[in-house]
């Protein structure tokens, strides 16, 4: 029976037929690998996700974590699943062999982890955050910090978090007030409160390594005065042994709409709940130089943003497959025009409107998965391309695509979940089926790791204008290369290319128009519409790339025919949505800017 988590055939098509990851084994970093080792890793990920993560997805949602004032309790299946995950070695799939990693291509590693996000996004959040934490310290930490904290995280003994937001500041990191007081021994004592910290407390691991943004006294105001600190839940000795509890206290759990299996916490640092060394203050260790914390944390945040897009895609994908399976099995009604009321009912997939909803989901989730894996492939290019120019190009293109890869799947794969519920009808609105939970879980993704609005400001206000517009030029030129290949291919690909070309031209024209007079308030007033429109253009590009990867001689194969039809749908129904959005942007509409608070 086909999996209802992800489509392995789609993953194989994207990785091998389109992205050609097997060619990466010609590069020194991946020379020990082969198509077989890539497939073995995907097989392992699918098996462990199916057997260890998926079975308790509903149970973790119904029995969310509890806190009795002393301990956080989760259902035991979460720990068992995470232990199984640690045994696979997949946490380190993309990391260097020198730190115990499998050194797989990032595209393969991303595909592997998507299985776990589709199976149980809440349980998979713990290793997701831990890996981001470890990657940041590998990039910015000292050798001693790597030995003390990273290696236990990669072994599955320690878990990690990132602590940015504070109750009064939210996403406005310039306004954080947590302070870090320097000590004579070179450590710091931290005092403050952090809010919305996923995985902030639990008993799933021996220790929790918090990465905390704070200010050293006398630091410059705003984001330029933020430093980054390692603050472990339990202090670690020079020999790696665990010592006293640090002065980090769980003040409470947040009770959420979805993602309920992941603890979400309010943490208090330095309130005297514990007294390491006989006094209050959470012991912290500075990462790198003072006042570089935000730049360092963005290393983790950019990784997390692409990971959020992958998680949103996975939730949309599994919801699509489950609604597809239901539509094939659920008999109801008869074809339009049927005259015999005694005729047998047909499966609801026979009804055109149900097929419309399924086709919309397919176009969203398969387009989003292509984008996520394309970005992972860019990371491989950034790290291993032989030419410096190719590495720099991959880095810039990935920078431009990051806010889109975070936000487009978070919006449109959530729409896919909404359609999955609709396909099931009343049954989809009940807890008897998974699709309502997938919607609730996915609703977080347009919010965390930078809201939709923040990503829109990042795309239009920074990524498209940086380096004198080099990001915009590279994106449109890269799409233009695909368009040219499609024109040369002829047939339907050429026709789709013509439609995409006209829309890409509007991206360039509208971007220049918005910044024509340098007024940031007016330029950014409708940034969310810009993000959505450019996101649709990028997904149309992903679909054109997939069409070009389909072999013409296999046009009759149902998988290939389905891909072509989904591409047609996206170009016919979705891409035209960008027209009114670009019209709004081109007019530099002031409606939202001119609205006054007292008019509401």
Region annotations inferred by a language model:
Residues 1-125, 148, 584, 590-600:
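Amphipathic, small/basic residue-rich leader segments at the start of a protein or domain
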Residues 466, 481-600:
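C-terminal amphipathic alpha-helical interaction region
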Residues 187, 191-245:
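A short core secondary-structure module
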Residues 2-5, 259, 374, 396-474, ...:
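Alpha-helix capping/hinge segments and adjacent helical runs
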Residues 131-133, 142-145, 149, 448-451, ...:
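A structural-propensity feature for long, helix-poor, extended segments
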Residues 366-405, 511-525, 546-558:
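C-terminal helix-coil-helix/basic helical segment that borders enzyme active sites and/or dimer interfaces
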Residues 65, 126-130, 141-183, 376-395, ...:
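Internal maturation/activation junctions in enzymes
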Residues 196, 235-251, 256, 266-304, ...:
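A glycine-rich, basic-preceded beta-loop-alpha segment at the flavin cofactor/substrate interface
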């Amino acid at each position: 029976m086909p999996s209802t988590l992800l489509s392995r055939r789609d993953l194989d098509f994207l990785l091998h037929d389109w992205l050609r990851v097997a060619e990466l084994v010609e590069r020194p970093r991946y020379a020990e690998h082969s198509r077989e080792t890539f497939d073995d890793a995907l097989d392992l990920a699918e098996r462990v996700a199916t057997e260890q993560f998926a079975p308790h997805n509903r149970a973790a949602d119904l029995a969310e974590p509890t806190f009795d004032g002393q301990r956080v309790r989760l259902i035991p299946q979460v720990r068992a699943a995470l232990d199984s995950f640690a045994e696979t070695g997949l946490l380190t799939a993309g990391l260097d062999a020198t730190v115990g990693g499998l050194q797989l291509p990032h595209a393969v590693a991303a595909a592997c982890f998507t299985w776990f996000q589709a199976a149980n996004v809440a349980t998979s959040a713990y290793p997701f955050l831990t890996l981001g934490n470890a990657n940041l310290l590998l990039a910015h930490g000292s050798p001693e910090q790597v030995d003390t904290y990273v290696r236990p995280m990669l072994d599955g003994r320690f878990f990690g978090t990132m602590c940015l937001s504070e109750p009064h500041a939210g996403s406005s990191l310039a306004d954080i007030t947590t302070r870090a007081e320097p000590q004579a021994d070179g450590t710091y004592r931290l005092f403050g409160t952090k809010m919305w910290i996923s995985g902030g407390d639990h008993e799933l691991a021996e220790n929790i390594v918090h990465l905390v943004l704070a200010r050293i006294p006398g630091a410059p105001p705003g984001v330029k005065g933020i430093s980054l600190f390692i603050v472990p839940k339990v202090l670690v000795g020079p020999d790696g042994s665990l010592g006293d509890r640090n002065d980090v206290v769980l003040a409470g759990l947040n009770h959420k709409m979805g993602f309920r299996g992941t603890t979400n916490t309010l943490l208090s640092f330095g309130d005297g709940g514990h007294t390491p060394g006989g006094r209050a203050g959470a012991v912290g260790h500075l990462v790198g130089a003072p006042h570089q914390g935000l730049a360092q944390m963005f290393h983790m945040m950019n990784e997390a943003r692409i990971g959020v897009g992958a998680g949103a895609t996975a939730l949309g994908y599994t919801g699509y497959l489950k609604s597809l399976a239901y539509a094939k099995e659920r008999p109801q009604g008869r074809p339009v025009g049927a005259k015999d009321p005694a005729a047998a009912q047909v499966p609801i997939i026979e009804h055109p409107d149900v097929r419309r909803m399924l086709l919309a989901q397919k176009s969203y989730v398969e387009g989003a998965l292509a984008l996520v894996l394309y970005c992972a492939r860019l990371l491989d290019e950034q790290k291993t391309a032989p030419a410096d120019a190719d590495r720099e190009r991959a880095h810039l293109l990935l920078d431009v695509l990051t806010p889109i890869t975070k936000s487009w799947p978070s919006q449109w794969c959530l729409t896919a979940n909404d359609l999955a519920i609709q396909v099931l009808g009343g049954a989809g609105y009940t807890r008897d089926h998974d699709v309502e939970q997938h919607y609730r879980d996915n609703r977080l993704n347009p919010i965390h790791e930078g809201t939709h609005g923040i990503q829109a400001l990042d795309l239009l206000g920074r990524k498209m204008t940086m380096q004198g517009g080099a990001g915009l030029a590279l994106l449109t030129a890269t799409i233009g290369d695909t368009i040219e290949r499609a024109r040369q291919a002829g047939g339907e690909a050429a026709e789709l290319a013509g439609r995409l070309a006209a829309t890409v031209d509007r991206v360039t024209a509208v971007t220049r128009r918005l910044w024509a007079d340098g007024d940031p308030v007016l330029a950014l007033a409708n940034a969310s519409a810009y993000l959505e429109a450019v996101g649709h253009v990028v997904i149309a590009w992903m679909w054109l790339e997939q069409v070009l990867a389909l072999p013409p001689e296999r046009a009759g194969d149902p998988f290939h025919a389905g891909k072509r039809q989904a591409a047609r749908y996206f170009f016919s129904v979705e891409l035209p949505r960008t027209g009114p959005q670009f019209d709004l942007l081109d007019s530099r509409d002031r409606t939202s800017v001119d609205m006054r608070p007292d008019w509401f």
